[in-house]
Structures are given as structure tokens and as C-alpha cells.
């Protein structure tokens, strides 16, 4: 698949694809090439468990139209602490773009509480712009107001 994931730019350098032993993600290494958001790499590297496990990814693909059912099947909201802000994660959409977010599991965050701050910060800033730009701005409606209903339902209390 040719594409861009969270700020990764195409590189002319060569490398070898390897599988991470901790999170089983495919990463490219060799000739000075390192995949960001991975343990020991230059952008978010550091000690501890593999950061790919905690990363919230946005996957953008313009291959085909995505069709969803006419009903709202599922929406998820997470509260990270009792006084914190609720983050709504949409899983229903229709259009030419695909967004998969996030891959972070709450159980993994509980194991390493330092990672919660990074994920919350990323979700509050970068993800919302990516979702708006690649999903909401190009949504195709066909006599269906489910996105508007979900938005009204979630924003009513704010």
C-alpha cells in the first residue's frame, strides 16, 4: 500500500522490513532508516515498551468508496480520568476515505500510565484535524443524516 501515516514522508533510502518482537508491527530499518513512533527511534523513542502499541494511527486510503449501513451501529466514548474530557471516537462514516483510529487499548494504557498523557494530547490535537479534513469534509450523503444526528447527540451537553 502506498500512502502516508501520521507524518511519515516517502524516503529514497533503502532498508529492510522487520517485524517488531513486542507489537508485531512491520518497521523499516537499515541505512539510517528508522520508522518513527517505534522503540528507540528518533521522534518518540525512549526506554520501555514498544511505542507502536500505544500509538494512535490515522490510516488514509483513497482506493474505493466505503459504504456503511443506514443505522448507527456503534459509537465509542472514552473518559481517561474522572475529571477529564470525554473523547468521542467515530467508527461510522461514508465516503472516499478510510480512517482507522485509534489502535490504543485502554488495558495497555493502564500498564504504563506515562503513555496516557501522550495519547490524550495526540487525540485532542492531531487526530481531530485529520478526521475533519479526510472524512467530514468529503462525506457523501444519500438521504442519510446519521452523522448529523451523532454530532448533535454528542455535542448537546458541551
UniProtKB/Swiss-Prot annotation:
Belongs to the UPF0329 family. This is UPF0329 protein ECU06_0050. It comes from Encephalitozoon cuniculi (strain GB-M1). The lineage of its organism: Eukaryota, Fungi, Fungi incertae sedis, Microsporidia, Unikaryonidae.
Amino acid at each position: 500500500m502506498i500512502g502516508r501515516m501520521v507524518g511519515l514522508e516517502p524516503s529514497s533510502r533503502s532498508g529492510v522490513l522487520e517485524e517488531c518482537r513486542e507489537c508485531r508491527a512491520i518497521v523499516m530499518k537499515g541505512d539510517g532508516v528508522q520508522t518513527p513512533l517505534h522503540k528507540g527511534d528518533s521522534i518518540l523513542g525512549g526506554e520501555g515498551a514498544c511505542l507502536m502499541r500505544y500509538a494512535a494511527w490515522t490510516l488514509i486510503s483513497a482506493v474505493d468508496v466505503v459504504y456503511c449501513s443506514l443505522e448507527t451501529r456503534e459509537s465509542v466514548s472514552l473518559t481517561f480520568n474522572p475529571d477529564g474530557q470525554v473523547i468521542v471516537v467515530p467508527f461510522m462514516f461514508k465516503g472516499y476515505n478510510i480512517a482507522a483510529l485509534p489502535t490504543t487499548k485502554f488495558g495497555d494504557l493502564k500498564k504504563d500510565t506515562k503513555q496516557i498523557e501522550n495519547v490524550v494530547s495526540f487525540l485532542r490535537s492531531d487526530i481531530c484535524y485529520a478526521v475533519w479534513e479526510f472524512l467530514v469534509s468529503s462525506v457523501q450523503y444519500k438521504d442519510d443524516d446519521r452523522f448529523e444526528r451523532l454530532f448533535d447527540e454528542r455535542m448537546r451537553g458541551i
